[in-house]
A protein has these predicted regions:
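Polar-ligand-bearing catalytic/cofactor-coordination segments
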Residues: 1-125, 139-182
């Protein structure tokens, strides 16, 4: 779908790799994604883990920003890694998944719950209807939980911004890059 090419050798690559090393972020490569073929949207991210970690920059990002601004964007992305945001979000998703499975198991066995909804008396025959009810109810729960997810997301973004500010010895490159992103 998207093509990834290694970032050309030169000053930009040297600056970005130096920043990553300074932050203690080991990346195998820096790659450029051909995002301009589908959109004018700009982005940067890291993918992989251990010795297979890669930094990916959209070609649009490289075209729109000065090297110092690109460093600030990369510092922000590294901030997500250093602050442990990915494992925290994965753990939260796993927790919600476990709660969902627990509810399915518990409510499938509940004669009171199933009886009030007119479901079968045999526990094996209740799984489908209970799953259907919980699937519909999940939409209601996620509607009410969405503000908390947004709050957590904003908290993580502010933490990554603070990390980038500290890495860049001030807020100006980050502010400038964020203005160009939006």
């Amino acid at each position: 779908f998207n093509k990834l090419e290694p970032l050309d050798e030169g000053e930009l690559k040297d600056r970005l790799m130096t920043l990553a090393d300074k932050a203690g972020f080991r990346a195998k490569t820096i790659e450029v994604m051909d995002g301009s073929k589908r959109s004018g949207h700009s982005n940067a991210f890291f993918t992989g883990f251990g010795g297979f970690r890669r930094i990916v920059l959209y070609d649009t990002l490289i075209e729109q920003m000065e090297p110092e601004e690109l460093e600030a964007v990369l510092a922000h992305e590294i901030g997500h890694y250093k602050c442990g945001h990915v494992p925290k979000r994965l753990a939260l998703s796993a927790l919600f998944g476990l709660v969902g499975f627990w509810l399915i198991a518990h409510l499938t066995q509940s004669s009171w719950f199933c009886g009030h909804l007119g479901f079968a008396t045999d526990a094996q025959d209740r799984l489908g209807p209970v799953f259907l009810v919980l699937s519909v109810a999940a939409g209601v729960f996620t509607f009410w939980l969405a503000p908390f997810g947004s709050l957590l997301s904003r908290k993580h973004e502010f933490e990554a911004d603070a990390f980038a500010r500290d890495m860049m010895c001030g807020p100006d490159p980050l502010i400038s890059s964020l203005r160009k992103l939006h």
